[in-house]
Amino acid sequence: MPQILIPIVVPAIAGGLCYLVPRRVKGVREVLALAGMAWALIASIQLFSRYPLAFTRPWVTLGNLDVQFDLMLNHFSAFALIFATLIGLGVTLYSMSWLSEKFDGRRYYAFMLWAVAATCGALLSNSLLLLLIFWEVLTVILFLFVNLGSKKDEAAAGAAKSFVMLGFSDAALFLAVALIWVKYGSLSMKDLSIFVGDAYSTWVYILMMIGALTKAGAMPFHTWIPAAAEGAPTPVMALIPAAIDKLLGIYLLARISLDIFSIGPGLMMLLMIVGAVTIVGAVLMALIQHDLKVLLSYHAVSQVGYMVLGIGTGIPIAIAGGIFHMLNNVIYKTLLFLSAGSIEKQTGTTEVDKLGGLARAMPITFIVTAVAALAISGVPPFNGFVSKWMVYTGLVELGARGFNSYWIFLIAALFGSALTLASFVKVLYSGFLGQKPSALSHVRESSWLMTIPMIVLALLCIVFGVWAKWPIDSFINPIVHGAVGTSVSGVVDLGGGFWDPSGATGLIIVGLIVGAIVLAFGKFSKRRVGRVFIGGTKPAEHMDAMHFTGSGFYGTIRDMVPFKGFYINAEQKVFDIHAVGGRIGDVFVQGLRSMHSGVLSTYLAWCVIGLGAIVFAVLSALLRELVAR
């Protein structure tokens, strides 16, 4: 079998075998899933050094369209394959401990393997039609996957909403593919080069952009992600919305914006506006959430804004920053969802108001969560800072080239990072640093099957920040150089680039050492500690009642003048395109309902009118045919 097929075929077959293994047989599914993911990862690593690589076979003929099973390995797809399969392997290992008896392991592991297989197929597809098929397969798998959640009502609602919104975007993508075939006569991505200079090409690009942005989760096509988070199994959120969908959505957006289409300032501005609105809007929603999974889902949306903003600038360093942020987001967002799953596994809840004081009981989970929180907030020296810094630098360069409104987008990006950090202060305090409720006195650290993937991802957050030159030169620079002809190899280097991560890390370490010394001296000083006066009652009786969580820190933000209107509109689902579409649909439904009066003669009249219209259309077509002859 050609090596390019292994990341697709092996997980697909392993998933089928997992589905066929009887439920009463223990351990076989886990071994099959782990082996399938590991094989796919090894093959992906081997493929990275072999691009460009092609595989083409005749498939099916549809009229004048000869559909081929056309795969093409380029640098972008090669590096995305590695991280798609790496995350798949980590989540599989994690699930071996997280999964409980109440879940159907047959379907769970089968869906996980099939999701990775479909992802690899989409990344490797050179044919737009083949990409669309794998794209739709992943949508169906997500629908089935979310339905596996233990909260049946929330899972069903989230799955339905995800399927409708992603199905709509898939339809837009299908229409774009059809329009490309009609006018340009090719579906090969490597052969297409479309200048966006008229309404036709503009609408084709916008349709493909909608498909990419919905998959990635950018506003206003984002609400399926928080809906899925309410009921989906936590590892599913770590695998698909946090990792796979970000890889695929931004991969397609970058391919159409940098390779397939040549877009002008208008569409670039549209991308930048979408990016800035997504950054600020989603992080404002994250601030007021009380469920950890829903909070993380809004942050998953917010981070997409940096990727879209970077690509939209058209500046090489910002494009590189957007793509690098895609990679970084896959790492730390997966880690955050796995951390949430670890908390959920040990405490039975993800409600931040019911948590507290877990740092001593779950030290590994606390440390990796803190690393991921600092990374997503853009705090140096972690990986999230480097990619955000590159986007900021690109925006400043855009201003130097004469774009006077650059500061609006720069402020939005910086403001988003500040609010992200504020949000995770709440998470860390409420979950780990606050007072532990008595109901959580039994909590212990998760098993090594769950902590190992989290530790690996936390280390990547550090390595890709401190030694950012390596991933940028190895993964990102060839993509940008191939697309715009400019190298970004020197932007992060020792003393020679815009940002010196190693030197900054040294300064941070020195600061931490000085702080530790000051803290140590403080330990030796004597201080008087008194009991809190609570009206003479016994403290033990009211300890849980006096449990103050971090969520209260941001309780007043809803009433602040700049944000009050935003939150009111959000509660009314003004920004939920699914809800808005439903309201518009209800108007048509009510109009049609008025025609269904229950009177038989009225129904017969409608049938006669419809039949007459059909007969008229057929006779008109026949008459035109006869006249033409």
Where are these regions (language model features)?
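Hydrophobic transmembrane alpha-helices and their helix-loop junctions in integral membrane proteins
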Residues: 90-106, 116-131, 141-446
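Hydrophobic alpha-helical membrane-insertion segments
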Residues: 34-48, 169-175, 369-380, 453-473, ...
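Transmembrane helix-loop-helix hairpins at membrane boundaries of multipass inner-membrane proteins
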Residues: 1-6, 16-110, 185-196, 477, ...
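Cytosolic juxtamembrane amphipathic/interface segments immediately preceding
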Residues: 66-69, 353-354, 437-442, 494, ...
